[in-house]
Structures are given as structure tokens and as C-alpha cells.
Amino acid sequence: MLIEHEVAFVLHVRPWRETSLLVEVLTQAYGRLGLIARGVQGLKKQTLRAALQPLQWIRFSAIQRGELGQLRQAEALDTAPRLKGETMLASFYINELLLRLVPRHAPVNELYLAYSQTRERLRTNDSLAWSLRLFERDILETLGVGFNLECDANGTPLDPAAHYVLDPLEGPRRLLSEHNNAERRDTATGHVLLALAHKQIPNTNDLAGLRRSMRAVLLHHLGGRGLKSWEMIAAFRHQDTSP
């Protein structure tokens, strides 16, 4: 299959054999693709190598045969966000999450748009924690494993003042006892879940519980094996948490 002048975001790049690269990209029309960029060493290929960097938005042409395609041409369409510190680690996180959860060639049209929006939020450092929670919600919904964020697992509308455990398969389950602080630590309030459902930024105090709750859900869908970016962010923050 010939792919011509398709736009994509670069997710990951690694060496492939002696002079080539394996480039993972996210496209709107074809989903996630793995492309081999051959012979990219040398001064003449400097512009191409610069375009094939994580977070870069590119236009490319390729020939797709089997699992991996052959990259024929690529050019940068903008300047990739220049990130540092926790924002840079957040970019590693969203890319690793995509690589681990989204299979190649799966139709993910809406996720491409969500990635584009998250990339711009990272560029402007706009409500980082909230931006990541929105992206996590979008990736789960795109993969068909999201859940209703307005009702609990029994179909009862969420109480904004209550606390809920997020069951990876059934959705929010109300915490029966509000007095156990250890249990409440890993729960999300009804208020923050409703905010996530409607994409309305909540009170900052609710975001820590939502982060831990979403991590448990993601860990389930990751087969119990965590992300390297979680470890990097934990080291950066000196605590064992996900972004």
C-alpha cells in the first residue's frame, strides 16, 4: 500500500540495524504505524533526522508492506514543543502509553485529535495534571475500555461529595466507608469524575486522587506491568506516583 503526503506525530525512534531507524508514528487515517527510515546517517540526512524526533508533527510518504512500512520521505510541519522537567517527562509518558496500549494499524481517529490537543497543552504548560487525565480518559474510550463517568457501576448517578474506587472493568464503585483514610487515598471524588466526564477542570485538591485511581485502571490494561515513564517521574518527584 502506498501512503502519500500523510500527516503524523512521531512517537518514538530507535536505531534499526546499522544506518537506519525504526520510527513509530500516529496518523489520523491509518492509526499507529511502524516505519523503517533507511540510510539516515550523514550530513545530507540531517534535515530528515531532525524531522524524525518524538513529538514532531510531520508529513510523510511510505510504502506499507506487512507490519512495518518503508519511509520514503518526511518533513517537519512545525517546531516541536521544547519541553523540560516534568513537562518533558509527561511527553515521554503519553508516547509510551500509546506505544503500550494502541496496536499498530488500529483505527484511532479521535485519539489523533486528542494527542494533538495534549501536545499543545504541553507546549503551553497548561494545567499539566488535568491534561494528562483527559488524555488517559480519551485513550481508554478510543480502545473501547472506558466507562461511564456520570453513574456508578450500579447505574446510580454519582454523588459529587462521595468517594469512588475505579473498577477497571465496571467503572466507579462508591466507597462504603468514608472514615478509612487509607482507602480514601486511592479513590476519586464524584466531583472530579463528573468534571472528567464533561472536560471541566476541577478543584486542584481532587486531582491527586484521580491520578492514583486512573493509574490503577491503566495498570490493569497494561497487564500489570508499569511504564518506564512512571519510574522516571517518580524519581523526578521523589515519590512513587504516576503523572
Swiss-Prot record:
- Gene3D superfamilies, per this entry? Nucleic acid-binding proteins (2.40.50.140), Recombination protein O, C-terminal domain (1.20.1440.120)
Alphabetical GO biological process terms = DNA recombination; double-strand break repair
Pfam families associated with the record: RecO_C (PF02565), RecO_N (PF11967)
Q: Which UniProt keywords apply?
A: DNA damage, DNA recombination, DNA repair
Q: Does the keyword Cell division feature in the UniProt annotation? A: no
Listed under GO cellular component are:
bacterial nucleoid
Its biological purpose: Involved in DNA repair and RecF pathway recombination.
PANTHER family referenced in this protein's UniProt entry, alphabetically = DNA REPAIR PROTEIN RECO (PTHR33991:SF1)
Q: Which family does it belong to?
A: Belongs to the RecO family.
This protein is called DNA repair protein RecO
Q: Name the species this protein comes from.
A: Xylella fastidiosa (strain M12)
